[in-house]
Amino acid sequence: MGSRVSREDFEWVYTDQPHADRRREILAKYPEIKSLMKPDPNLIWIIIMMVLTQLGAFYIVKDLDWKWVIFGAYAFGSCINHSMTLAIHEIAHNAAFGNCKAMWNRWFGMFANLPIGIPYSISFKRYHMDHHRYLGADGVDVDIPTDFEGWFFCTAFRKFIWVILQPLFYAFRPLFINPKPITYLEVINTVAQVTFDILIYYFLGIKSLVYMLAASLLGLGLHPISGHFIAEHYMFLKGHETYSYYGPLNLLTFNVGYHNEHHDFPNIPGKSLPLVRKIAAEYYDNLPHYNSWIKVLYDFVMDDTISPYSRMKRHQKGEMVLE
């Protein structure tokens, strides 16, 4: 657990990301894929039910012993809250109401944010669009770890701690890599979230509030679903920047595992990404992919060739249009 990883820097590349070229090729060959570029109204009802489910859980845990509060937060609440962050990912791509009702998606994202306990839906949308446009761009893509993360988390034990602390790194990394001025929507998101948290504490008590926050922190840290954070873009095979996952946890995560398909077609809702793979099978079936996020987490910690430095990175090119 104490041996150091062999990598001491990111994988600097001087080619463009592969997704734009593959998208053009696939659309030229299979123009029917354009019919999948439409919102998924089922998202609305699924998310409403998820919020109501967590509200019910808040009520149930208010009188439980603390050990059951924490157990419930990890065994149940973490799955709901991590899934909700991926619902917010869908909303960030306007998958709920479509591009023509962009603001409806922003308000709905704030609603979906409520049971997570920490305001982030508006900020996530801003940074996530940069991640798609400028994948791996130095100083722009905040999905890339900082140099400190790559330098410090360089043993199996430290990488294990890094996995546990993932939600904190995702929360604070943008402040160091690509800080942005606060927008009025972020202020509204924060006020709405803090008000909701206060109401939960006032009407249901401290145990419900702790359950909500613990569900988010535990669910985004050392949790099977959190394998997607590493599986998506960490370079387990040299030269491959994005990886898909085709295992059963896609059922809980709005098909976020179909990540090559998602980066090729970010305006297609997760529900339809398996159809993209089916239609253009020759483009995806031979790409390296995963069937277990748990194995991804294990390999990340135990493999001495993999670390937070295992990301492909690019220097900025020309003038960038940021969110």
Curated annotation (Swiss-Prot):
Keywords: Disease variant, Endoplasmic reticulum, Fatty acid biosynthesis, Fatty acid metabolism, Isomerase, Leukodystrophy, Lipid biosynthesis, Lipid metabolism, Lipoprotein, Membrane, Mitochondrion, Myristate, Oxidoreductase, Phosphoprotein, Transmembrane, Transmembrane helix. The gene is DEGS1. It catalyses: an N-acylsphinganine + 2 Fe(II)-[cytochrome b5] + O2 + 2 H(+) = an N-acylsphing-4-enine + 2 Fe(III)-[cytochrome b5] + 2 H2O; all-trans-retinol = 11-cis-retinol; all-trans-retinol = 9-cis-retinol; all-trans-retinol = 13-cis-retinol. This is Sphingolipid delta(4)-desaturase DES1. A motif (Histidine box-2) lies at residues 128-132. GO terms for molecular function: electron transfer activity; retinol isomerase activity; sphingolipid delta-4 desaturase activity. Changing residue 113 to D: In HLD18; decreased function in sphingolipid biosynthetic process. It comes from Homo sapiens. Ubiquitous. The keyword Manganese does not apply. Its EC number is 1.14.19.17, 5.2.1.-. It is a multi-pass membrane protein. GO terms for biological process: ceramide biosynthetic process; myelin maintenance; sphingolipid biosynthetic process; unsaturated fatty acid biosynthetic process. It is found in: Mitochondrion membrane; Endoplasmic reticulum membrane. The keyword Endoplasmic reticulum applies. The modification Phosphoserine is found at residue 307.
